[in-house]
């Protein structure tokens, strides 16, 4: 929080204020690691839901207080400010409600507990307050905001309802404090007292792994389940908006995006998530999915391009979602992380930095380490494949030949990493596997070798497919350049436009032709010495041969 205050005091730019707001919200997340969520059954979902709950409440209540305090500064723009806050509050309401449902499901054993325990009664009171606040927000959006647009003098009615909402929110926060200090119906004793193995992974220890169980086992991670559902839903809403407007959007982009969302759900809530902390080989399956399979599918969906086409640009100089996305894609930071060398080093170097440092064991033993691992590999994979096959707007990408060379080098490094894991004799994260105690050291080494083979083999398929996509994009780029050249030549009666000619010939041939032209011009300049005209021969004295030569 102190960092957020420091950033806001140091800069007055819109980007700086946005960074300060993001840092302030991130500072709330450590609070979710305390309270009922710490060390209990379903620890991961409890911590995630509490973190989302805190962020949603802060944005909702804090945003409303900010609108009330700054309403005089808005002047004639108050209707627009309130309308935009209403949209933000709607999303915060959904986040608070959904995270509250998840958290309550972990604390309530049966529906009867809602009316027979003090915890359940407080939960019902909080739910009633949430519904009342939702109704007030609906009134804001349907009645007061249109009234403010028609008549800006109706500010008093808005302030009256807004202050009333703040009072009700304060009551809800008081109930939340009482709820956090009440004993829930489901005992929140540390699960280490019940099942030591379950205490290590945070949920009931699974049965021995089989291929069928890898496909059918489910342990929902509600955070990534909600993220994937929101990504798929918002994408389809944007596509529908484009089509209703008469614009086309290819199914070749929609299908990969939806497949990527589905694969993200499977990697974080299916078999790879259930057995990811139990065996090295199953952990490697989850890792490869998060790093090598989900990101290229999401990149092919072109989400930034879709967003820019679906959302209108603001005309008043303020920043909405579209403006923030544009600012981010063209920022200095974006140019750095999408640099081909940087993206490749982060992508490939993360393998070594993760598995050959304490980070690997930290990701197995702690929830925050696992979350950092998941987010990091998703982002690093997305940036790497964005440089290779992305079509979204952003910093200038390298030529296609450089992309292929970069991909081949990364593929070679990936194969070397897999072979190193397969042939290694040191057990990685050995303390964690010994705590589980379900395999001997010989079995651990064999399983680790299998994981290295998975890293080598599973990583080759997406690399080959991406290489084919790069070649296809390269061929399409050449064909489009040739088509532009032919059209321009036809318009100019088959004359060759120099610029299009250079584009069709390619950069290397264009540079060679330019150099040859410069040499010819210099040579022509050296020969351009004034020479006196040859005297006309005298027809009377000239010999026949001279006469014929002169003619």
For every predicted segment, state its role.
Residues 1-551:
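Alpha-helical membrane segments of multi-pass proteins
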């Amino acid at each position: 929080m102190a960092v957020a205050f420091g950033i806001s005091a140091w800069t007055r730019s819109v980007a700086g204020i946005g960074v300060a707001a993001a840092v302030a919200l991130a500072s709330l997340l450590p609070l979710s690691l305390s309270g009922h969520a710490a060390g209990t059954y379903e620890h991961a979902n409890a911590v995630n839901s509490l973190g989302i709950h805190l962020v949603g409440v802060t944005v909702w209540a804090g945003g409303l207080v900010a609108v009330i305090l700054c309403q005089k500064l808005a002047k004639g723009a108050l209707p627009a400010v309130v309308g935009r806050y209403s949209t933000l509050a709607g999303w915060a309401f959904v986040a608070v409600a959904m995270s509250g449902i998840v958290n309550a499901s972990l604390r309530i054993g049966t529906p009867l507990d809602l009316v027979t325990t003090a915890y359940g009664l407080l939960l019902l009171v909080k739910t009633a307050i949430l519904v009342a606040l939702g109704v007030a927000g609906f009134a804001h959006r349907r009645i007061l905001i249109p009234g403010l647009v028609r008549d800006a003098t109706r500010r008093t009615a808005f302030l009256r309802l807004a202050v009333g909402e703040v009072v009700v929110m304060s009551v809800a926060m008081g109930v939340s404090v009482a709820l956090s200090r009440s004993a829930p119906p489901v005992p929140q004793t540390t699960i280490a007292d019940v099942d030591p193995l379950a205490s290590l992974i945070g949920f009931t220890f699974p049965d021995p792994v089989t291929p069928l169980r890898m496909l059918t086992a489910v342990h929902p991670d509600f955070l990534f389940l909600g993220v994937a559902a929101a990504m798929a839903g918002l994408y389809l809403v944007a596509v529908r908006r484009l089509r209703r407007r008469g614009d086309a959007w290819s199914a070749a982009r929609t299908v990969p995006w939806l497949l990527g969302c589905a694969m993200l759900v499977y990697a974080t809530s299916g078999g790879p998530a259930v057995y990811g902390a139990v065996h090295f080989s199953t952990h490697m399956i989850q890792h490869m999915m998060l790093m090598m399979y989900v990101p290229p599918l999401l990149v092919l969906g072109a989400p930034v391009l879709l967003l820019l086409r679906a959302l209108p640009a603001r005309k008043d100089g303020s920043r909405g979602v579209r403006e923030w996305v544009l600012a981010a894609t063209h920022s200095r930071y974006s140019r750095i992380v999408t640099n081909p060398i940087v993206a490749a080093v982060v992508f490939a170097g993360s393998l070594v930095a993760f598995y050959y440092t304490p980070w690997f064991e930290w990701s197995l033993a702690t929830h925050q380490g696992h979350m950092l691992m998941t987010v990091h590999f998703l982002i690093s994979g997305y940036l790497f494949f964005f440089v290779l096959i992305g079509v979204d707007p952003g910093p200038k990408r390298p030529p296609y030949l450089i992309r292929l060379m970069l991909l081949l080098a990364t593929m070679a490094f990936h194969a070397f990493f897999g072979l190193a894991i397969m042939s290694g004799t040191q057990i990685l994260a050995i303390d964690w596997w010994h705590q589980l105690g379900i395999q001997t050291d010989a079995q651990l080494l064999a399983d680790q070798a299998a994981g290295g083979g998975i890293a080598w083999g599973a990583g080759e398929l997406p690399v080959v497919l991406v290489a084919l996509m790069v070649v296809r994009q390269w061929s399409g780029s050449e064909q489009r350049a040739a088509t532009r050249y032919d059209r321009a030549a036809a318009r100019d009666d088959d004359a060759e436009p120099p610029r299009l000619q250079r584009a069709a010939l390619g950069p290397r041939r264009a540079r060679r032709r330019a150099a040859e032209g410069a040499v010819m011009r210099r040579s022509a300049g050296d020969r351009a010495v004034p020479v006196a005209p040859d005297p006309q021969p005298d027809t009377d004295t000239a010999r026949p041969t001279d006469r014929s030569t002169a003619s």
